[in-house]
Amino acid sequence: GSEMCIRDSMRNIDTAMKKAYPKGFQKENIIYTELSNDKVMLFNYTSGTTGFSKGVMLTGNNLAGNVTFGIRTGLLKKGEKVLSFLPLAHAYGCAFDFLTATAVGTHVTLLGKTPSPKILMKAFEEVKPNLIITVPLVIEKIYKNVIQPLINKRSMKWALNIPLLDNQIYAQIRKKLIDALGGRFKEVIIGGAAMNPEVTDFFYKIKFPFT
């Protein structure tokens, strides 16, 4: 059946590749179909916040504009690492976690699992990404699970009301959060929706590197 054909193909793929590319598969062997950039290249789906999810028709220019922006602003550089956990069916994750990263030669690790705080923390520790691109919901969950239990302790609330000591504590919390996200990122970019003002205010207070 079809499964047997797939298994046979996988077993023979090395032999077939050597036969087709005796000098090895090189960048010159990659040939893309030439299409005008005003053609629809992709259907990306909205989150459905204003009703049912909608398929948005994106042209080559739409995608190229995002990638060009990412390259010109130096979001990512060749050899850096990215942990991709946003849906690639949405424009945000697709444009920056995948297309821009691929264009500049960034190493992309696909999470492949539902991004619960526990799974994300483990992945951040392993990958240590240089840039984190996310949505408010993910960051708010991390705040709820990592930060809130700490700052809601009675002793911590008391200490945060003492001048000078509060800044030292905020610095420690900032380091704890940065370390929890891999410790190597230059910035966390949060977009796609409005973030909880409580989380935003706290991040500004501890001088967390986000935008």
Where are the language model's segments positioned?
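Conserved AMP-binding/adenylation subdomain of ANL enzymes
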Residues: 64-81, 88-174, 184, 205-209
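Conserved G/P- and acidic residue-centered "switch" motifs that form tight phosphate/ATP-binding loops
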Residues: 48-49, 105, 192
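Alpha-helix-centered segments that form part of catalytic cores
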Residues: 29, 34, 162-200
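Conserved pre-ATP/AMP-binding loop-to-beta segment of ANL
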Residues: 21-45, 52, 75-81
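Conserved AMP-binding A3 loop
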Residues: 41-67
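Conserved S/T- and glycine-rich ATP-binding loop of Class I adenylate-forming
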Residues: 40, 46-49, 82, 87, ...
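Short aromatic/basic micro-patch
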Residues: 34, 57, 133
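Short, small-residue-biased leader/transition segments that mark boundaries at the very start
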Residues: 1-6
